Curated annotation (Swiss-Prot):
This is Cytochrome P450 monooxygenase otaC. Disruption phenotype: Abolishes the production of ochratoxin A as well as of its intermediates ochratoxin B and ochratoxin beta. It comes from Aspergillus carbonarius (strain ITEM 5010). The chain crosses the membrane at residues 13-30. It catalyses: 7-methylmellein + 3 reduced [NADPH--hemoprotein reductase] + 3 O2 = 7-carboxymellein + 3 oxidized [NADPH--hemoprotein reductase] + 4 H2O + 4 H(+). Signal peptide: none annotated. The gene is otaC. Pathway: Mycotoxin biosynthesis. The keyword NADP does not apply. It is found in: Membrane.
Amino acid sequence: MNMDSIASFSHPFLWTAFAVGVVYCCTRMVSELFLSPLSHIPGPKLAACTRLYEFFYDVICHGRYTFKIAELHEKYGPIVRISPTEIHINDPEFYETLYSTSAPRNKDPWFTTNFDVAESAFSTLDYRLHRPRRALIAPYFAKARVDRIQPLIQGKITKLMRQLDEYARAGKPLKVDVAYNCFTADVITGYTSYRPLGYLDTPDMVPIWSETVRNLVEIGMIARHLPGFFPLLASTGARCIQMVYPKLLSVIAFRVKCIQEVNFMWTHPETATKDAAQAECSEPALFPELVSRASTTPDITEERVLHEFITIVAAGTETTAHTMTVCTFHILNNKDILRRLRAELNDKFPGDATMDLQTLEQLPYLTGIIYEGLRLSYGLSHRLQRISPTDPLKYKDVVIPPNTPVGMSSALIHHDETIFPQSHAFIPDRWTDINERRRLNKYMVAFSKGSRQCIGMNLAFAELYMAVAALFRKYDMELQDTTVDDVKLHSDMMLPHAKKGSKGVRVILKPAQGGE
């Protein structure tokens, strides 16, 4: 076959392929814009036709789709179609309807499948399977159980303070999110497995850990647009990964560490029993308990335990640590807030009096700081989709068909000026009156709400109350080269990210006057 015959064959073939592609795209556009069951819901036409609209803002513009969604609500109203299949609602009064405690709610595979933890309760799509999976682990995070692990939390705070003492003596600046992530990681792993990761026992702690969870969720977010890309990249080896997407290396290392920990528990259950005798609290640990029940509970497999381990460790570290970071910045950035917090703590706990969780929870100003920190750290800043599997949802006069993913965003709810005036300001007094706190708590959605609410909420509150109180009772801190831009939401990569180039919240420490 000569070149002329090849050209004569390929030329009409390419034109035919091009024509078929054009017809397909036009047909798809007509279908999505006019024939889709969501065609009656307002929104940009391009978003209704293709996920490339979302891809542009979240991947190319690095986590800016949440901000674009806010603009779309200003243009189209409280309900907007943001993709071919998904609706977004920005109305705080609808939150408890969507995130219901009683009505069945499934999760959207678009949100969960790319984290590769399908066996975890967090990633379980169907509500019928989610209920027993959550019920298996929920008792370990109940308020009464968390109250009993105060010695473990206090032990980790003591270790954290030993590290901070070294920084204070040396006059070295501390990047607080590094310290706080190591603290929360050791708490969650010490409680759930008897075998803490030990980051607080490492000199200078483990700086890479504070980035690992962020990298994990960022990769999961990008991977849904590029299925197969990261598994393929992971198979090429460390050198290629370092050149193409180095953040993947820390995620692979984290997963390998989790596999090793779970495999050890699975193959050495007797060691878990021995570890329990030396643990910092007497409460049964979640993962050794699951392993011990595997022989009588078919749903408990090594893969299931691994997926729960990855999810609980990841979810139980960065979000709480980020809230502590936000609290730290705003306390230090406003001398009046620091003065009032110190006065409240010194009044209730004079001298070396022991601070217990139950008493700390009754302190109105400390509570205001914790709640305001949660409000401005958002939990997951990304929208959380829920699906009504059988019944249509009705928002005002708009009917949303069953099996439609519907999302709402804490980053939008927490900045609703009709509920939180001066919403970008850190104002603990919003929460100090107990009746006002009860009213506002309806709109505090950092832990989400409903049947899939964050399972670790009680543990997070305990860590926040105990750690914030202890740190500001003992240390004077001074911000160094840090501004509000270092804690302000600039991009939403599921977790809130500050502006590009931010070095985080850095402080210089010294013992507080009158401190320990």
